[in-house]
């Protein structure tokens, strides 16, 4: 049995079709079918029920799928371990973050990491926390940055920093003369907020309901840059981490009293998994960067 057999089996199981799996794998359907038959012969059981209009896993196939997935993860980890170099003269790092971190934290962190380790290939993606956790568990990422609490028991969460949400307005907004306003002022503000798929929006809605607040949400946007551009050009306001405003000209972050929401950012990685030298270096640099960010926010 070869790793190719495992890859082919998992592809057919995922797509529920030899045709779609063959297309995804860039192989011919007859070649794929032959490899699956070889696998079934080596195991001595049929893995797929081919009697219906769609391909379905047999009971034996369902059981073997769990072991096949874990085996593929271990093979991938082993390959990375072989190519891992402790002096960081080569290697790769797969990172995913929730979108609010990109402008004020991940951008500077990635720039510093690249400057120190230019031979490390970096892959950075923005996505929801749910997807980050899922991809980490499937060994499709090395590290993720999101928020506590973490839902998957397979993941370790290392605290990075605690951030507060602030009322962010344009410099020409009437409230921009204030450093702090009462939380109750949100009743009077017309807000631009991130859309519901963002963890930040989910947290805002939860805490507003808990505090008995009913802000006027007049625009929803599915990107941070769109929200910030609308704030710059209008008299609307938004709720975002205060640090984001410091990275963009023409914006002012106003603290709320009492604070609407404080949340802990965490670095996520799989428990008991091989950590490459690049992943370890990234963690140490992230912790150092967070100490600087936290110090700036406290002033």
UniProtKB/Swiss-Prot annotation:
Q: Which residues form the HTH lysR-type domain?
A: 1-58
**What induces or represses expression of this protein, per its UniProt record?**
Negatively autoregulated.
Q: Which domain of life is it from?
A: Bacteria
Which InterPro entries did the record assign?
A: CynR_PBP2, HTH-type_LysR_regulators, LysR_subst-bd, Tscrpt_reg_HTH_LysR, WH-like_DNA-bd_sf, WH_DNA-bd_sf
PANTHER family on file = HTH-TYPE TRANSCRIPTIONAL REGULATOR YBHD (PTHR30419), NITROGEN ASSIMILATION TRANSCRIPTIONAL ACTIVATOR-RELATED (PTHR30419:SF8)
* Family under the similarity heading: Belongs to the LysR transcriptional regulatory family.
Q: What is this protein called?
A: HTH-type transcriptional regulator CynR
Where does this protein come from, organism-wise? Escherichia coli (strain K12)
